[in-house]
């Protein structure tokens, strides 16, 4: 949001079987000439455990303003051990209005993230996150061949979360 505040929210439902669905929305602003004003994501997946390892597989669809013409979807797989988790997302499909010579297809971008989360004795959850987004589709969206890195610290209690987050994206393009 160009160093401005964002209002975000989401709703999730998880069944005892491990299947889940959810939605998330935020205002967005990517700078001068930006046609985006909001992002609305929907996702569905299946979470399960094998021994001490937790798994998560699913699909995530990113929906932007109709003027933006940059909607896309990803498939993902995540694995957790103890307080740590790692997730890999891969571009599955796009409805992006591609420029001349661009043809984004399956696997044209990826997102790799590492997370750590722990609950303190007072019931407050603390989370640390770092992720990296790269690939041809990411380059077109961010304007930089080296992709971008995002990171955050979060605090949660009783269903509410406060998060401080940032990226290495400066001035409309990721710094190398």
Model-predicted regions and their roles:
Residues 1-176:
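Outer-membrane beta-barrel proteins
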